A protein has these predicted regions:
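Conserved class I S-adenosyl-L-methionine
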Residues: 21-94, 96-103
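A short glycine-rich, Lys/Arg-flanked "PGG" loop and its adjoining helix->strand segment in the class I
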Residues: 176-191
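A short acidic, Gly/Pro-enriched loop at the edge of an enzyme's catalytic core
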Residues: 153-162
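C-terminal lobe and adjacent flexible extensions of AdoMet/dcAdoMet transferase-like proteins
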Residues: 269-308
């Protein structure tokens, strides 16, 4: 016979499992995409498997599915809130926030900055396709194709807050030039906020593949789980994160119903957190604090806050 405590535990477990199954079913049913399979391949005739390196990944196809794959709306809202809260508390004398988001992707953060009272909110990204999609998603946001490694992209002292979210720092090819330009574009005493991770411990599972927002499977697994799987209406998606030291690969695969496969390989350089702070400080910035994102389920992920 089960005692009352055991009965309650069984009921709670049953509710949890039922909710989990319902959420997974309902979210899968809603994962409809606006893309056509033909958009995923440059050559439609004689290619069954296409492999894209980091310089060619962010095309029209990927731009259209990016937000659904990453599923980062909650994360963007919290990162924007944390960043503005710190910037305003650190510089209460600033009448308005003039923010630049480097590597803005489809512009989610930029639009949130705009709606939260920033006097100026600009986003730049190297990808034409991501900017085009971002303008469709957020028609009022100021999104531009631009390169942070080019000093003339903006004027000196144009911003008092610059951000790099969602692994952008790890994609940079010429970090020295980029940091030098950010230092130039920021007004003296202004803020620079960078997303960073503990590469050994952070959860690489995409939000779309997690059962609940902010839920990490790593707590309940003896070995690190690195593979994400998500079902969409036109393809099956799978991703895997691996690293050896600072060299990391994020591999994605789209399997279409006709048997064609699109594979993508993101190459990143992920230094230790101490090394990242040292790199940024060597460009003239002062490290002030980090904001731990564990409170929203992103363990071992942080917003590093610097001042010019």
């Amino acid at each position: 016979m089960l005692d009352s405590v055991q009965i309650v535990l069984v009921i709670l477990c049953s509710i949890f499992i039922a909710n989990y199954l319902y959420l997974r079913w309902s979210s899968a049913a809603k994962r409809k995409t606006a893309v056509e399979m033909t958009e995923a391949f440059e050559n439609q005739d004689d290619v069954s498997t296409a492999i894209y390196g980091v310089d060619h990944i962010y095309d029209d196809f990927y731009a259209k599915v990016y937000d659904q794959v990453i599923d980062g709306k909650v994360r963007q809202e919290v990162e924007t809130h944390f960043t503005l809260d710190w910037a305003k508390s650190f510089r209460p004398q600033a009448k308005t926030i003039q923010v630049l988001d480097v590597g803005c992707g489809t512009g989610g953060h930029v639009d949130l900055f705009r709606t939260q009272g920033c006097g100026k909110a600009v986003g730049i990204d190297l990808s034409d396709a991501m900017i085009r999609q971002g303008r469709l998603n957020h028609p009022k946001a100021d999104l531009r194709v631009g390169n942070a490694e080019v000093a003339t992209t903006f004027a000196a002292d144009e911003f008092n807050l610059i951000t790099m979210f969602y692994f952008t720092y790890y994609y940079l090819k010429d970090r020295d030039s980029c940091l030098r330009n950010i230092f130039l574009w920021l007004q003296p005493g202004s803020c620079f906020v960078v997303h960073g991770v503990n590469r050994e411990k952070f959860d690489p599972i995409l939000e779309a593949a997690s059962p609940f927002v902010g839920f990490s499977v790593q707590k309940y697994s003896k070995e690190r789980v690195s593979r994400s799987k998500v079902s969409f209406d036109k393809f099956e998606y799978e991703a895997d994160f691996q690293h050896e030291g600072s060299d990391a690969k994020f591999k994605e695969e789209f399997r279409f119903k006709n048997g064609k496969i699109r594979r993508q390989i993101h190459s990143l350089r992920i230094p230790t957190m101490e090394e990242m702070v040292a790199e940024i400080e060597s460009a003239g910035f002062s490290f002030k604090k980090y904001i731990d994102m564990t409170s929203i389920g992103y363990e071992y992920q942080y917003l590093f806050c610097f001042v010019r």
